[in-house]
Amino acid sequence: MSTSTTIRVSTQTRDRLAAQARERGISMSALLTELAAQAERQAIFRAEREASHAETTTQAVRDEDREWEGTVGDGLG
């Protein structure tokens, strides 16, 4: 069994978390685990989107994309 700890949240937050856990039929601990994993996934996707956006704004990448687009019509393949 894993160790546990206590966290302090407002009564309102506790009640909201308890209601969400109850609706899903899981414990508050399981709900918090799911929410933490979801936040981590969202952060990863956000970082990937930001990196992709930054990459597409550089002139070198736009130039390379233009070169690749030119090869589509060269009849070689």
UniProtKB/Swiss-Prot annotation:
Keywords: DNA-binding, Toxin-antitoxin system
Gene Ontology process terms (BP): detoxification; positive regulation of growth
A GO molecular-function annotation: DNA binding
Annotated region described as Disordered, given as residue ranges: 49-77
Subunit structure, interactors included: Forms a complex with cognate toxin MazF7.
Function: Antitoxin component of a type II toxin-antitoxin (TA) system. Upon expression in E.coli but not in M.smegmatis neutralizes the effect of cognate toxin MazF7.
Name of the protein in its database record: Antitoxin MazE7
Organism of derivation: Mycobacterium tuberculosis (strain ATCC 25618 / H37Rv)
